[in-house]
A protein has these predicted regions:
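Active/binding-pocket-proximal capping segment
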Residues: 109-114, 155-158, 169-171
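Outer-membrane beta-barrel channel domains
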Residues: 41, 50, 118, 135, ...
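Outer-membrane beta-barrel signature, preferentially recognizing the C-terminal barrel domain
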Residues: 36, 84-87, 127-130, 158-212, ...
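Face-selective signature of the C-terminal outer-membrane beta-barrel domain
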Residues: 1-120, 144, 148-149, 240-247
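Membrane-embedded beta-strand positions of outer-membrane beta-barrel proteins
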Residues: 1, 58-60, 107-109, 139, ...
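Outer-membrane beta-barrel strand-turn architecture
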Residues: 49-53, 97-102, 135, 140-147, ...
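Outer-membrane beta-barrel translocator domains and adjoining extracellular loop/strand segments
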Residues: 9-24, 68-77, 117-125, 163-171, ...
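Extracytoplasmic loops and strand-loop junctions of Gram-negative outer membrane beta-barrel proteins
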Residues: 23-31, 74-80, 89, 119-125, ...
Length: 247
């Protein structure tokens, strides 16, 4: 079991001089302060033993995180932030490896349960608090054929939005540029089917992927003002991709 604590404080002064249509110079200054604090407790257990001429591994992980996010700016050109996140994640996995002649097989299954509570000004926001339950199977087949080596794998992984991406407040960069998080983001899951072939110095790799709910930063007008832009992460529609590489 491990315990981790991390804090980050950042003060920033933004001074701007803008020449208006009347050729008059307008000076402005904004002073911001951000204070993030994190505490994490994590534990992991893995057991391995032989089974049916192969090797079986089973295990589990648990983590609990508390994060506090404070942001103030003077003058108050955007709203101040007082946000808190409480998150716990529990996972269990099983993995089995065995050879059948020249064929090597590795199969696994992982389960993850995530409980995410979101608070603004010490009030839990039910709409932005979520639970997730995911299964991630995996399979790898490796086979040497003469002087060649072939491998076929299937695996799935998950990208969970960072806490910075999940914040609800708006950060002031300058009078024309703002950025924010999006507490309604959902995790993105990528499922990959990969074929690899190698012969002497030649390596071929083909990857077919299905990406669900990828997180991308989108830019839009801020407060219906076309000269002000807001950068905000969003989930985009699911899509398929194909990659090929030859070296």
């Amino acid at each position: 079991t491990d315990y981790y604590w991390y804090g980050d404080k950042n003060r920033m002064t933004i001074k701007e001089s803008v020449t208006g249509e009347d050729n008059q110079i307008k000076n402005s200054q904004a002073d911001s302060y951000r204070n993030n604090r994190n505490s994490l407790v994590a534990s992991k257990l893995v057991l391995g033993f032989p089974l049916f001429k192969g090797e079986l591994s089973v295990g589990g992980e648990y983590s609990s995180l508390n994060r506090r996010m404070l942001y103030t700016i003077v003058p108050e050109v955007t709203s101040n932030e007082n946000e808190k996140v409480k998150e716990s994640m529990t996972s269990a996995f099983v993995d089995y490896t065995r050879s059948f002649g020249a064929l090597s097989v590795q199969a696994g299954l992982r389960y993850e349960y995530n409980d995410f509570d979101y608070y603004t000004n010490e009030i839990r926001i039910d709409l932005q608090s979520k639970t997730y339950s995911n299964w991630f199977p995996s399979l790898a087949l490796s086979l040497p054929v003469g002087k060649t080596q072939m491998q076929l794998t299937y695996a799935a992984d998950i990208y969970r939005p960072s806490y910075n991406e999940l914040r609800s407040g708006v950060q002031y960069d300058n009078q024309y540029t703002y950025e924010s998080g999006n507490p309604f983001l959902t995790p993105s899951i990528t499922r990959n089917l990969t074929y690899a072939f190698s012969w002497k110095w030649v390596n071929l790799q083909l990857i077919c992927s299905h990406i669900s709910d990828e997180v991308c930063t989108m830019t839009q007008s801020y407060q219906n003002n076309p000269i002000k832009s807001l950068a905000r992460p969003e989930n985009i529609n699911s899509y398929n991709s194909f990659q090929a590489g030859l070296t």
